[in-house]
Amino acid sequence: MLSPQRALLCNLNHIHLQHVSLGLHLSRRPELQEGPLSTPPPPGDTGGKESRGPCSGTLVDANSNSPAVPCRCCQEHGPGLENRQDPSQEEEGAASPSDPGCSSSLSSCSDLSPDESPVSVYLRDLPGDEDAHPQPSIIPLEQGSPLASAGPGTCSPDSFCCSPDSCSGASSSPDPGLDSNCNALTTCQDVPSPGLEEEDERAEQDLPTSELLEADDGKIDAGKTEPSWKINPIWKIDTEKTKAEWKTTENNNTGWKNNGNVNSSWKSEPEKFDSGWKTNTRITDSGSKTDAGKIDGGWRSDVSEEPVPHRTITSFHELAQKRKRGPGLPLVPQAKKDRSDWLIVFSPDTELPPSGSPGGSSAPPREVTTFKELRSRSRAPAPPVPPRDPPVGWALVPPRPPPPPVPPRRKKNRPGLQPIAEGQSEEGRAVSPAAGEEAPAAKEPGAQAGLEVRSSWSFAGVPGAQRLWMAEAQSGTGQLQEQKKGLLIAVSVSVDKIISHFGAARNLVQKAQLGDSRLSPDVGHLVLTTLCPALHALVADGLKPFRKDLITGQRRSSPWSVVEASVKPGSSTRSLGTLYSQVSRLAPLSSSRSRFHAFILGLLNTKQLELWFSSLQEDAGLLSLLYLPTGFFSLARGGCPSLSTELLLLLQPLSVLTFHLDLLFEHHHHLPLGPPQAPAPPGPPPALQQTMQAMLHFGGRLAQSLRGTSKEAASDPSDSPNLPTPGSWWEQLTQASRVYASGGTEGFPLSRWAPGRHGTAAEEGAQERPLPTDEMAPGRGLWLGRLFGVPGGPAENENGALKSRRPSSWLPPTVSVLALVKRGAPPEMPSPQELEASAPRMVQTHRAVRALCDHTAARPDQLSFRRGEVLRVITTVDEDWLRCGRDGMEGLVPVGYTSLVL
């Protein structure tokens, strides 16, 4: 049962075939065109174009049928038409869709079928005597055009809708010489024409060898004498398959072959259709059985039992062209035409090009280029010299910066990597011959076949700039991991040293003693010199240099800031918070590094070192806030979790050991963990020392000259043993200014500037100070002040006193040191300090200090005293100690414990 659409198409094709048959019949019989009825010529004239039959002498219509007598084509027509020759064979030529006059219309009814090729006309070849005429020039069309089924004894065009039984019954009529329209069918000797075989061989050349059917029970040997049947479909399809995946496989012998036997046989191979066509063929003897081929939803082709030595192939296209040209125009003999105009359009998309004829027959190469062949050429391995020029705009060299298109060249494949080809279609990549040739190279031992690294030219197009960016990223990641492994190695070495230190213990008591830093300082040294620096570097790795702060804007980050941020109030970190508070209250630990070390010592004491590191790694927000993505803890949290696991495994043995470490061990033992102390700079060379001494001596003489003592200093230096030294000059300058005198050492002049001259500084000052007050030259002092830019008179009042200072104590005073030097000491109002210093030596023995607290001497050279006692000052040792006496006893007294008695 046909669908409505296919039934409509069958009816339309049937009507069209009737019109074509009528037109062909009228073109062969011009006398019938004068009227609807005509008298046929005498029956003896066999060379005419009239039909011959039992209706001779009666009026017939255009179909040679009597209007009074119903036509019984299978019973009443005589056998005389068997030897009748159709003269139209001489003027019929094989038409191809590629003919210049008809290439625009492939078939007059091709638009009736939306998805199939047009149906061929069924004509029946009748057996008869050999005709004197050679094989007609009608040859099968190219494989893309509709062909005649060439089945012997096919039915009339209305067989589209008939059943196999009716067709077989019609084919077994006693008079098979006429068709359903009472038209004589031409007979011809079955002589294979060279053109036919050549065309068949060319058709065979297009068949891919991968689709040939294997030998089965339906395959027939060409040497059999018994006639066999070949079932040709209603229409033929080009062997180059379309997108709908129609696949037709034919044997290499598709035509009529003459094997030297009188009764020629038909040789057939079962044809396979991927889109649902199934043709069932069976080998039968002549006159035995009829085969029916099922074609796509009920379209059938019926085969007669009788093999005939001749076939006439006619297509819709040929009939339409003869009808257009008219009966008077002879057909031009067909030559081999270029069918690229319609072959390219209908060329299917196949995976592989045709690989030659299966039967071994060699045919000349076709000059037609199809899309399939172009695709096959592009997939084939390129020869050393390219067979054709590359398209315009393409380049076989690395592209320059201006042109954006990238050449479709093969990328360089590293050993062991899959080659990647660009510029090809997906199916081309799948079956690329070049890829198949290079595939064995990827299976070499030791090759990394699992990686695919794509290399591309740089944007600048410079060959030297070609880099594997992914390989670089992998190498960078590898270097980063190696760096982190180095941090873990340092931790591992330190842990091994600590464990080896405890390995000397034989019992738990000895282990406890070895873990106590007071009993065994070596463990403290080991922890501070090996483990603490390793953990400090680990925590500081990848740490951001600054941390945002609400008040100061940013604070410098350090491992101790990580400790501060990680210790939060909570149940799990309560003990850690207690330890953090304890370390923070240790005043001697001023640097963040020493505090971090003390925190590590406390973690070892409480066996929480592993706990703190695990809690630090679990806090993702803290890590993102404090660390860069390349830091150790960031990598351990993200891409390399094995780092954190390995760190915890390394620290796990320390949780078993017992430690009693002093948190101030570093402060007490002064370990050289900080920056080493800079060595004392070497002293100046002797020449420089002499120069400096000479300059200082000149300064002393200048001061003496300003104070009127130049006469005394003018004497020979060897004669005066009490020559003022550079220290005495500076002492005099300090005494004159009274600015550099310390409050704690007030009354003990020049103790800061002459620490090595404990007993002689005050004596020399006492001997030299009275001289400037007595013999001071006012002009000399004014000259020195003007030399240094000190203002003159406005700095003094009428009585010589200084002006009062400004009310604000924040403002600088109006008088300077050089102004005091210029003015000198006023003679009418000497200060009490100057009076005390200018007193004779016996007066200085009465200078005393009062004790502020009780003090017990710690050494024999110190003096013990009680609070409130008055001690006699003998001399000043340095800025911290005084030599005092009490009740006939002398000793050292701290300056801070006394106050000066005025």
Swiss-Prot record:
Tissue expression remark: Predominantly expressed in brain.
What Pfam families does the record tag this protein with? RUN, SH3_9
Question: Where is composition skewed (Pro residues) in this entry?
Answer: 381-390, 398-407
Q: Which CDD domains match?
A: RUN_RUSC1 (cd17701), SH3_RUSC1 (cd11958)
The residue ranges of the RUN domain are 522-666
Q: Which residue stretches does the UniProt record annotate as biased composition, category Basic and acidic residues?
A: 291-309
Which segments of the protein form a coiled coil according to its record?
Answer: none
Compositionally biased residues, Polar residues: 277-289
* Bias type Low complexity, positions: 94-112, 249-261, 433-450
Biological process terms from the Gene Ontology for this record are:
protein polyubiquitination
* Keywords of the record: Cytoplasm, Cytoplasmic vesicle, Cytoskeleton, Endosome, Golgi apparatus, Microtubule, Nucleus, Phosphoprotein, SH3 domain, Synapse, Ubl conjugation
Q: Provide the record's note on post-translational modification.
A: Phosphorylated on serine residues following nuclear translocation.
One Gene Ontology cellular component annotation?
cytosol
Q: What is its main location?
A: cytoplasm
What does the annotation give as the result of altering residue 531 to A?
A: Abrogates nuclear redistribution
Annotated SH3 domain ranges read 844-902
Annotated disulfide bonds:
none
One GO MF term on file is: actin binding
* UniProt-listed Gene3D superfamilies: 1.20.58.900, SH3 Domains
Q: What PANTHER family does its record include?
A: AP-4 COMPLEX ACCESSORY SUBUNIT RUSC1, RUN AND SH3 DOMAIN CONTAINING
Per UniProt, subunit arrangement is:
Associated component of the adapter-like complex 4 (AP-4). Interacts with IKBKG and TRAF6. Interacts with F-actin, acetylated actin, TUBB3, STX1A, KIF5B and KLC1.
Task: Write out the domain note.
Answer: The RUN domain is necessary for NGF induced nuclear redistribution.
Q: Give the protein's recorded name.
A: AP-4 complex accessory subunit RUSC1
| Natural source organism | Homo sapiens (Human)
